[in-house]
């Protein structure tokens, strides 16, 4: 009886310690957009909206695609 009581107490203490410890979330953080879009790479026929979106997602942004930033510049991959 004494051994069982010790094992159950130890198990409950371990469960309490694990549940009260801070856990890191596995999801990536989403970066806030500041002053509109965050633009990086130049878009080409090879580097299109899909690849731009994948790069933005892997960088922590919720989405991205190719935008015309100014009329005199080529399209840029912008994350938002």
Curated annotation (Swiss-Prot):
Biological process terms in GO annotation: defense response to fungus; killing of cells of another organism
InterPro entries in alphabetical order: Defensin-like_dom
Signal sequence segment: 1-27
SS bonds (residue pairs): 39-79, 43-66, 52-77, 56-78
Keyword Signal: yes
Organism superkingdom: Eukaryota
Chief location category: secreted
Record key words, sorted: Antimicrobial, Disulfide bond, Fungicide, Plant defense, Secreted, Signal
Any GO CC annotation of this UniProt entry: extracellular region
Entry annotated with the keyword Signal: yes
Localization (cell): Secreted
Pfam families the UniProt entry points to: Defensin (PF24552)
Family to which this protein belongs: Belongs to the DEFL family.
Protein name according to UniProt: Defensin-like protein 50
Gene name of this polypeptide: LCR49
């Amino acid at each position: 009886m004494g051994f069982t009581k010790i094992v159950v107490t130890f198990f409950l203490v371990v469960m309490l310690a694990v549940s009260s410890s801070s856990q890191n979330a596995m999801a990536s953080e989403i970066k806030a957009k500041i002053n509109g879009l965050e633009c990086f790479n130049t878009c080409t026929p090879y580097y299109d909206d899909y690849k731009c979106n994948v790069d933005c997602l892997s960088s922590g942004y919720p989405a991205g695609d190719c935008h015309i930033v100014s009329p005199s510049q080529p399209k840029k991959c912008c994350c938002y």
